[in-house]
Regions:
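N-terminal subdomain of nucleotide-sugar transferases
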Residues: 1-44, 81, 109
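Short, solvent-exposed loop/turn segments at secondary-structure junctions
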Residues: 9-12, 41-43, 90-93, 119-122
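Short aromatic-enriched loop/helix-cap "lid" or pocket-rim segments at secondary-structure transitions
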Residues: 15-18, 45-50, 97-100, 125-129
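N-terminal beta-loop-helix "entrance" segment that forms/cooperates
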Residues: 43-63
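An amphipathic, basic-hydrophobic alpha-helix
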Residues: 56-100, 138
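Short, flexible loop segments at the rims of nucleotide/cofactor-binding pockets, characterized by
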Residues: 59-65, 126-133
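Active-site proximal beta-strand in glycosyltransferases
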Residues: 84-89, 103-126, 152
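Membrane-proximal helix-turn-helix segments that form the acceptor-binding/catalytic region
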Residues: 131-152
């Protein structure tokens, strides 16, 4: 089994800067075979400008570029049913392409999917409630529940 790691973009003021390093060290220590799926940052500032948890533009840009790379790997047959895709955050721009692709792919190319739910609409104290985003976020969460082979952590 190989883990395809979908990490978060690095921000100076958040734990995300260290998160990929911590994860890679843990995988190496345990002898886990893994691939870091790369994304492209919108700029080099590593700052949160719009939003309060992650930068709204930066998260969207990084997540979509990362998903484009994941889709290329899936199309090339690099990811199989024996593998896992681990998303560091349940909210990942481009996530709707997963059920779209997986439900039309042969079983042999349907990996296990792991999504880390850090808060989202299920948490009444999450920022999505403050910014009026709870309705669409809860619908997004329902979509995530329908992804084949999904496990929400």
């Amino acid at each position: 089994m190989k883990i395809f790691y979908m990490g978060l973009e690095p921000y100076e003021g958040r734990y995300t800067l260290q998160l990929q390093d911590w994860t890679e060290r843990a995988y190496k220590k345990r002898g886990v075979e893994y691939v870091v799926v790369p994304g492209t940052t919108i700029d080099d500032s590593k700052a949160i400008v719009t939003g309060q948890v992650l930068d709204a533009h930066g998260r969207s840009y990084f997540g979509m570029s990362q998903f484009m790379n994941l889709v290329q790997m899936m199309k090339a047959g690099e990811i199989t049913k024996d593998d896992a895709i681990f998303f560091e955050d349940m909210f990942q721009p481009g996530m709707e392409s997963l059920p779209y692709i997986l439900m039309q792919s042969p079983e042999e190319y349907r990996p296990k999917i792991y999504l880390r739910c850090l808060a989202q609409a299920v948490d009444p104290d999450d920022f999505v409630h403050v910014w009026g985003m709870a309705k669409w976020m809860s619908l997004y969460e329902q979509m995530c529940n329908e992804i084949p082979n999904v496990n929400i952590l």
